[in-house]
Regions:
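N-terminal "arm"/small-domain region of PLP-dependent enzymes with the aminotransferase-like
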Residues: 4-69, 201
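Conserved PLP-binding catalytic core of the aspartate aminotransferase-like
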Residues: 50, 295-340, 350, 354-355, ...
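PLP-dependent enzyme catalytic core of the Aspartate aminotransferase-like
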Residues: 54, 58-62, 66, 93, ...
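Conserved N-terminal alpha-helix of the aminotransferase class I/II PLP-enzyme fold
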Residues: 58, 62-106
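Active-site phosphate-binding strand-loop segment of PLP-dependent enzymes
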Residues: 146, 150-205
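PLP-dependent aminotransferase class I/II
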Residues: 237, 241-313
Length: 408
């Protein structure tokens, strides 16, 4: 049996597609220790620098003292502890929905929620670049699945017309992300909402890379566009801008009650540690504070700095730098690491074949000098590796008013 895996691994190595784990021996932050070397970290999704924040650490420490380490059971048995309830109450208030439900991860949230809400007589229409968790959840549901090219409104409309003609009474669910994880661009949400309403569909929106970054108090793209009430299911994560771990679903109380009864990844998983729930609650509280708004504005200031240095227009804290060839992408990542920067080489199957890239993620924890040093290092890359990045313009509405350049 092991020989089979050895051959398969060798085949991956031959195509520069093998992956391995690298041990970080320091807390998550703008600077990390990797294999004995200090590196400026441009690989983390810790957009607000909260993963090692003193307020979150204190909240977790207090919860450990009061509730211990583990929950000891699934949520439906005896694993629902006060920190879980407080977190879900805070999430619902923050997202202005009736209720919220937390899962052990964002992947678990998608994998449990989509099959619980959608079945074999329904139709799912999904953006081609959606996260693997959304694709897997859609496949697991048994619904008819139609995929439209990335952000292609014409194809989305065609699929909606087909679905409605096929069965006028069918439940149709559009699934998309608000900010896409590999390209960093935004969904055309106003247009998608209009199509949703025109065809009587529902909208499932994954705000994983938008919450904490975009919208009033970091509530996400739906809030920036004043469309949150038109989103039927709001999904998000606690592990990126909020700096902790886990996923959540926000929506109607009836929907979350249904998920408690039918979402298998929720029912059959041990509850997240109460300390993580307490830390996530502290992160939500921080986002609603003046300090949280200042932290977001600092992040956008950092995005502006790199944008100016590289003459790009990022729509989020994710900046892709397309190279194409896997070997050249790995070489570029190693070049940057040799110069003191930790940047991931993203390859197939995470992205399409021929679309290998460097993926820079920015944080409020970065200093201006670190960003300018990164830009200089990118410009020094061998010519074959200096491919232009994806230039995804911001939506017409741009950032929230408080985040315009004049506010920095």
């Amino acid at each position: 049996m092991s020989d089979i895996y050895a051959r398969q691994l060798e085949a991956l190595r031959a195509r520069s597609l093998d992956r391995h784990l690298r041990e970080i021996s320091s807390p998550s932050g703008a600077i990390v220790d990797l294999e004995g070397k200090r590196l400026i970290n441009f690989s983390s999704n810790d957009y607000l620098g909260l993963a090692n924040d003193p307020q979150l650490r204190e909240a977790a420490t207090k919860a450990i003292a009061e509730f211990g380490i583990g929950a000891g059971a699934s949520r439906l048995i005896s694993g629902t502890q006060s920190p879980h309830v407080r977190l879900e109450t805070a999430l619902a208030k923050w997202k202005e929905t009736e209720a919220a439900l937390c899962f052990s991860s964002g992947y678990a949230a998608a994998l449990g929620t989509i099959p619980a809400l959608v079945g074999k007589n329904d139709v799912i229409i999904l953006d081609k670049l959606c996260h693997a968790s959304l694709i897997d959840g859609a496949k697991l549901s048994g619904a008819t699945l139609r995929i439209f090219p990335h952000n292609h409104l014409g194809k989305l409309k065609s699929h909606l017309e087909w679905a409605r003609q096929k069965n006028s009474a069918a439940r149709i669910v559009i699934i998309t992300e608000s900010v896409f994880s590999m390209d960093g661009d935004r969904a055309p949400l106003p247009e998608i909402v209009k199509l949703k309403m025109d065809f009587g569909a529902q909208l499932f929106l994954d705000e994983a890379h938008a919450v904490g970054v975009i919208g009033r108090n970091g509530r996400g793209l739906a809030f920036e566009e004043n469309l949150s009430q038109e989103v039927d299911v709001q999904m998000g994560t606690l592990s990126k801008a909020l700096g902790v771990s886990g996923g959540y679903i926000c929506g109607s109380r009836n929907m979350t009650e249904w998920l408690i009864n039918r979402a298998r990844s929720f029912i059959f998983s041990t509850a997240p540690p109460p300390a993580l729930a307490a830390a996530a609650k502290a992160a939500v509280d921080f986002l609603l504070s003046i300090g949280g708004e200042k932290r977001r504005q600092r992040l956008w200031r950092n995005i502006d700095i790199l944008a100016e240095e590289l003459s790009i227009q990022p729509a989020s804290a994710i900046v892709p730098w397309i190279i194409g060839d896997e070997k050249e992408t790995l070489a570029a990542a190693q070049n940057l690491q040799d110069n003191g920067f930790l940047v991931p080489a993203i390859r197939y199957p995470t992205v399409a074949k021929g679309a290998a890239r460097l993926r820079f993620t920015l944080s409020a924890a970065h200093e201006a000098t670190q960003l300018r040093s990164l830009a200089a290092a990118i410009k020094r890359l061998p010519k074959r590796d200096r491919t232009k990045p994806i230039r995804r313009l911001r939506s017409a509405r741009g950032r929230p008013v408080a985040e315009q350049r004049t506010g920095h």
